[in-house]
Amino acid sequence: MATRFPKFSQGLSKDPTTRRIWYGIATAHDFESHDGITEEKLYQKIFASHFGQLAVIFLWTSGNLFHVAWQGNFEQWVQDPLHVRPIAHAIWDPHFGQPAVEAFTRGGASGPVNIAYSGVYQWWFTIGMRTNLDLYRGALFLLFLSTLALLAGWLHLQPKWKPSVSWFKNAESRLNHHLSGLFGVSSLAWSGHLVHVAIPEARGQHVRWDNFLTSIPHPQGLQPFFTGNWSIYAQDPDSMNHLFGTSEGAGTAILTFLGGFHPQTQSLWLTDIAHHHLAIAILFIVAGHMYRTNFGIGHSIKEILEAHTPPGGRLGRGHNGLYDTLNNSLHFQLGLALASLGVITSLVAQHMYSLPAYAFIAQDFTTQAALYTHHQYIAGFIMVGAFAHGAIFFIRDYNPEENKENVLARMLEHKEAIISHLSWASLFLGFHTLGLYVHNDVMQAFGTPEKQILIEPVFAQWIQATHGKTLYGFDVLLSSNQSPALNAGANLWLPGWLDAINNGNNSLFLTIGPGDFLVHHAIALGLHTTTLILVKGALDARGSKLMPDKKEFGYSFPCDGPGRGGTCDISAWDAFYLAVFWMLNTIGWVTFYWHWKHITLWQGNVSQFNESSTYLMGWLRDYLWLNSSQLINGYNPLGMNSLSVWAWMFLFGHLIWATGFMFLISWRGYWQELIETLAWAHERTPLANLIRWKDKPVALSIVQARLVGLSHFSVGYIFTYAAFLIASTSAKFG
């Protein structure tokens, strides 16, 4: 007899209802709960799945390169990056009528195409690619890597090649290899690529495999390196008149510390980027020799944690027991990794627009908006996941005996103080920010805008001034001519930095006023409330005053309202569920702010943002409503244009989003009755009754319905805003 899905759970596979399918999908990746799982099998499965993940990533990037080379216009774009619209791929759609075919035939293409707003053209151009052949070679190489990763994954599941648990728990070796090998050597390799291929290409010198070994990246070769005259590599940088991709105005420097942006491309100097990666490489390669492994030298993390006695005994037993707690809990490790990755992803969003690294990307406004929004949403989901796995750690892996009186136990002991402080901060931010906005709305409505409460963000302006922004007249540190900081570092403070920070043509330290002050605090409210929900969910996951320890209840123990008595207090799943809504709303405010401020900057009417962002009606009317007009006219009774696909996605996104509420605000018995009625009708309808099912239809559980509702809400919300963002920006700037 064939085993029914799911094979990993015999108990579940025998369930006669549709619950078998839903629970099977829900627990497919919860390896810990599978039949016959051992610690060794668990680690090996996760290890092998990492190779699968790499294979998918390589295949995806290979596909990007291949489709652009096959159906894109990379070679035409390279000739004129500012005026040719980059093509992602062709659209094959038999449903298109003639008006649609004409509307979507752009960028010099012969048929309907999709425009690329991902920035890949600018990236490939910056790193030295120039022809379709370059793209094809890249695609083929990545396809080879993808196959290699799949083979490695399969190999490490074979008996002879399965690593042991002790190998996975050798933290020092893993840290050394990841620091030196993963970060250090890869940064060194990237610096090498920039110096040997990308920088020469930016100066009109074509370096490929046939002349790679004969083209010296610097006229003096390695002599300055071996003689210690490293500064020679920084002499003669590209001039301010350098035309990117040509020898006109090009210098010979390969590792510089200029600061600021290349005047033509509006992106960071490639020689600065190469220098940065070389410095990172050295730092990480050194760091990767820090921990004790084979030779009995270096640090032992366990010894460090146990030797560190907190001053005055104020933190109990400090970090005692933490090494084993962390090293034996995959959820703890994953939580920390996700928290780090979430922060980094958000920083990537901030730096991609303020310090653009890719040539001409700063002038492609739709791409800038898309990349910022994309990275902020990704960061939000990753951060929420960090807390979810932190909560699972407390439920499944935390052992109070092993952590007596250490910092982890003490944090749990004063969780009430942590939660109440976060609660107070959220309440303070919420009432004051909303109060200011609403007051300003009322003043606008009554025709007395001069009575608005407008607060200048003086502390933030002062911080901008210390970094060199002179506009506010603070005359402090780098913005002061007499400052010892400025004089002492005349050649150190990246000569181009001070020009860039005071130049109105980039997004570096944007000028801020009362509208920024208010939205900053609205975002702070969102961040603090999301954090409050997540922190409370994790700290109370194992129990509260009402229910001391719920280890056996598991993570997806549902909160069922006051009728069940106190279960909402200790449901980490429900905290996660609630936090996702707050996270999405917070990132909504972040992206609204970024987008509106930049639209007005790019259009040269920044006063619109400054005047309208101080009250809520301004946001609704002058940002959302005003910018959705082009979108809603994607197709109308007079015909259609290239925005029609975004108009359709905008409507469809709203539909998915609204469907979520059907699952979120409903009574479970109603669904069961509805399903039974549909099943009854199906079985009695000719033709339809030829199709039978073996599983008895059962309504979703509370947790499942919340998950389905939440996923619809999230996907619909993001679809809707993505369509709005891309259509409103591309309609204005192309």
Swiss-Prot record:
Organism superkingdom: Eukaryota
Gene expressing this chain: psaB
Alphabetically ordered keywords of this record: 4Fe-4S, Chlorophyll, Chloroplast, Chromophore, Electron transport, Iron, Iron-sulfur, Magnesium, Membrane, Metal-binding, Oxidoreductase, Photosynthesis, Photosystem I, Plastid, Thylakoid, Transmembrane, Transmembrane helix, Transport
Entry membrane topology: Multi-pass membrane protein
Function text: PsaA and PsaB bind P700, the primary electron donor of photosystem I (PSI), as well as the electron acceptors A0, A1 and FX. PSI is a plastocyanin-ferredoxin oxidoreductase, converting photonic excitation into a charge separation, which transfers an electron from the donor P700 chlorophyll pair to the spectroscopically characterized acceptors A0, A1, FX, FA and FB in turn. Oxidized P700 is reduced on the lumenal side of the thylakoid membrane by plastocyanin.
Protein name: Photosystem I P700 chlorophyll a apoprotein A2
Bilayer-crossing regions: 46-69, 135-158, 175-199, 273-291, 330-353, 369-395, 417-439, 517-535, 575-596, 643-665, 707-727
GO biological processes: photosynthesis
Primary location class: plastid
Any one Gene Ontology molecular-function term assigned to this protein's record: magnesium ion binding
Gene3D superfamilies listed in its UniProt record: Photosystem I PsaA/PsaB
